[in-house]
Amino acid sequence: MAIEDLDDANHKIAIKYRDRIRTGDTPFRSLYISNYVIDEALTLLRIHCSHRVAVSFRKVLEASTLVKILWITETLEKAAWEIFEKHADKEFSFTDCTSFALMEAEAIRNVFTFDQHFSQYGFESVPQA
């Protein structure tokens, strides 16, 4: 979201970090995104930017050699529901919980996000805003 939205407070930081990933200047060699996160991002880009930006974002993802799309299965959705149900004290979105379940299943510890919920859940968020 921050990469595509020019008005996002973290846009410049996100662009710099994305460029570092592209040049191999981070521990990441590829990025993963789930179909649930794509859904959320498309909706937000449509609302905050434009339909054109949202469509462009999806096309870039599909063509990217850097980004791999991972799908939330029924099993992962059930695990996400357990996380969501368990954490009434946090303001995790259900999409956040699907990401947590997916990351746990794939043994992914680091996440490229500015969403503090990931560090609250125990993942390492980069870059630091």
Q: Would you name each region that the model predicts?
A:
Residues 34, 38, 58, 77, ...:
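Alpha-helical structural signal
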Residues 1-3, 21-24, 44-48, 64-68, ...:
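Alpha-helix C-capping/helix-to-loop hinge sites
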Residues 32-34, 92-93, 115, 127-129:
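Histidine- and aromatic-rich ligand-binding microenvironments
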Residues 100, 105-129:
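Acidic, PIN/NYN-like endoribonuclease modules and their adjacent C-terminal/linker elements
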Residues 12, 68-109:
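Active-site neighborhoods of divalent-metal-dependent phosphate/nucleic-acid chemistry enzymes
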Residues 61-73, 87-89, 118-129:
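Short acidic, glycine/proline-enriched helix-loop-strand junctions
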Residues 1-33, 46-59, 129:
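Short, well-structured N-terminal submotif of metal-dependent ribonuclease cores
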